A protein has these predicted regions:
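Class I SAM-dependent methyltransferase SAM/SAH-binding core
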Residues: 1-34
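A short acidic, Gly/Pro-enriched loop at the edge of an enzyme's catalytic core
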Residues: 36-45
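Residues lining the SAM
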Residues: 47-49, 78
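A short glycine-rich, Lys/Arg-flanked "PGG" loop and its adjoining helix->strand segment in the class I
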Residues: 59-74
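Conserved class I S-adenosyl-L-methionine
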Residues: 74-111
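Acceptor-substrate binding/catalytic loop of class I
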Residues: 82-90, 117-132
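Short alpha-helix
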Residues: 123-147
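Core SAM-dependent methyltransferase catalytic element
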Residues: 140-142, 167-192
Length: 192
């Protein structure tokens, strides 16, 4: 089962599923609306890069995760570190607060998948500190098994990056001085 707000992402996922002969279902919807489209529980819920920055309400997000996990089910989460989102695009100065203080409205050329794409768009994002993420997960009946931070990104998706090992990127002038990614593994409590 895969869920995404982007119809293009769903189309791409369906194509990959077809190419790999995977029997997978996909739902295109706002994650907050998922209970309207799905009534099933899972052993694992996995959420990856670039997801929560689009969401204003992490309590609602964590409620959704908990709702769709079976008791003792595992939540696996990997995301760009909130420290990364504090910087300007070139990582030269701090432009934003670490903590969520409301919507950030920006205009950007290119896309996160193709920095050179001939497109300019306005978007709305939210910064979420680690305590906001962890506390909402715990508040919604999950127990944190691990929280890890990494000083690199597996993707070359930021300005001024350098690959220091295969598929490991850092901001060139910051080297290993900032966290770039974090991961959380949590388990839904048996009684929630």
């Amino acid at each position: 089962m895969g869920v995404d707000l982007s119809d293009k992402a769903i189309k791409s996922a369906k194509q990959l599923s077809k190419e790999t002969s995977s029997n997978t279902t996909f739902i295109c919807c706002d994650i907050y609306d998922l209970p309207r489209y799905l009534d099933q529980r899972f052993d694992i819920v996995f959420t990856s890069y670039g997801t929560i920055g689009w969401l204003p309400d992490l309590n609602k997000w964590a409620e959704i995760i908990s709702r769709f996990l079976k008791p003792n089910g595992q939540f696996v989460f990997v995301e760009f570190h909130p420290v990364v989102w504090m910087f300007d695009d070139n990582f030269e100065k701090i432009d934003y607060r670490y903590f969520n203080s409301g919507a950030i409205i920006e205009s950007e050329s290119g896309t996160y998948a193709d920095k050179n794409a001939d497109i300019t768009q306005e978007y709305v994002m939210w910064n979420h500190g680690l305590s906001e993420v962890v506390n909402n997960i715990v508040k919604n009946g999950l127990e944190i098994n691990s929280l890890n931070e990494y000083d690199y990104s597996p993707y070359d998706c930021f300005n001024k990056t350098k690959e220091f090992e295969p598929r490991k990127y850092r901001i060139e002038h910051l080297d290993d001085k900032i966290p770039m990614v974090y991961s959380i593994v949590a388990k839904k409590k048996n009684n929630s």
